[in-house]
């Protein structure tokens, strides 16, 4: 792609802005996890088993920081980073992620 920054040669499409944010969160978290573990190192048996119960170490306690007045979407991950309207968030479980 002629307009892509150097070293970025792939495109990921999404159906909406929320989906794009959810995808970006996932890519960022997986990139961090791969760099921490080692790119060619597979998950341990404990990580594989514990992730099915949403427990560490397979489901680590990572966080996404957002802005206090930002709107990032209405799906669970994106809604956890949105902080614009109470009507979007009330009665919906959310990740305990920080805001700046």
Placement of each model-derived feature along the sequence:
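PLP-dependent aspartate aminotransferase-fold enzymes
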Residues: 1-100
């Amino acid at each position: 792609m002629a307009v892509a920054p150097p070293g970025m040669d792939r495109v990921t499409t999404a159906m909406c802005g929320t989906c794009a944010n959810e995808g970006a969160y996932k890519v960022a978290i997986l990139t961090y996890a791969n760099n921490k573990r080692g790119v060619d190192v597979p998950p341990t048996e404990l990580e594989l088993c514990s992730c099915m119960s949403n427990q560490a170490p397979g489901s680590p306690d990572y966080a996404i920081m957002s802005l206090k007045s930002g709107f990032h979407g209405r799906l669970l991950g994106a809604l956890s980073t949105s902080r614009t309207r109470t009507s979007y968030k009330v009665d919906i479980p959310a990740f305990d992620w920080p805001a700046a």
